[in-house]
Amino acid sequence: MEREYEKNFYVEKASDIAARAQYDDNGFAKVELLPGVYHGGIQSFKCFLKAGHKVSPELFADKSVVIFFGKGEGELTDCDGVHKITEVAFYVPFMDKEKYEIHAIEDMEFVYNVIEMNQWDRAAFDRWHIRLPYFRLHSECVQYIQDCKGPNTEARMILCPKWHGRIILGTTRAVGEGTVEKGHPKVHQLNYCLGDSDFHMSVGYKAENNMETVQHHAGDWSFIPAGADHDLVSDPGKEVYYIWFEHYTDEQAMAKM
């Protein structure tokens, strides 16, 4: 397959992200992640909200948003009431139809993803999508089994295929193992590291013997272009814990699925 990107993977470390954070008078900072790298229609931002402060994120009529709450306790208030954020959590607002507000009880960190919707995305969304707004704590999400993952690896599905356009969302968590995956030729993958993460991410093309490895820790962000093989595995006693966020590359084909 023709490769769109020069590198096997792109990484931004948590410390570098935090160093770029500039707080406003409301205790809020937003930093774009890997700016200019992924040109497939998703912009991701690491957000920091200090304890005791609130933020009402921007609403979009023609774009969708997915939020990963990775650190710190808080509350999210929307048309369904008050959602307690007591662990890793996920939120998909109903575009510009319903407002919402995030209140930090502790210092919070979360990733705010803005997804463009072209004509194919919009047609698929209008035909069928999950009821929005959608809030889930990580522990409420269904577990799944996959043959590329270790026997003691916990995997959870957050957004199944076609639930919300071309995006697919889940988590992987383990100690001393992880996932060893063949490249997905039609799926780009973004990763957000959580918990006590300390693991190896190796990406490339095994048939070409060009795998490259980077050490990942909590708060790190990475992008794996479609097609690359990828292993995310921790050493004994170390944790691998990350959110994977996939974007299907062929919107016309997916619209027909």
State what each model feature region is.
Residues K97-E101, A228-D231:
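Short, charged beta-turn/beta-strand-edge "cap" motif at the junction between a beta-strand
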Residues D78-K97, A207-A226:
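Short acidic-glycine-tyrosine-enriched beta hairpin
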Residues M1-Q43, C47-V88, K97-K99:
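Generic N-terminal amphipathic/basic segments
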Residues L59-L76, G183-Y205:
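Short, conserved beta-strand element in jelly-roll/cupin
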Residues H188-Y192, E212, H217-M257:
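C-terminal functional regions that serve as terminal interaction/effector modules
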Residues M1-G41, N118-V180:
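A short, N-terminal "cap"/entry segment at the start of jelly-roll beta-barrel domains
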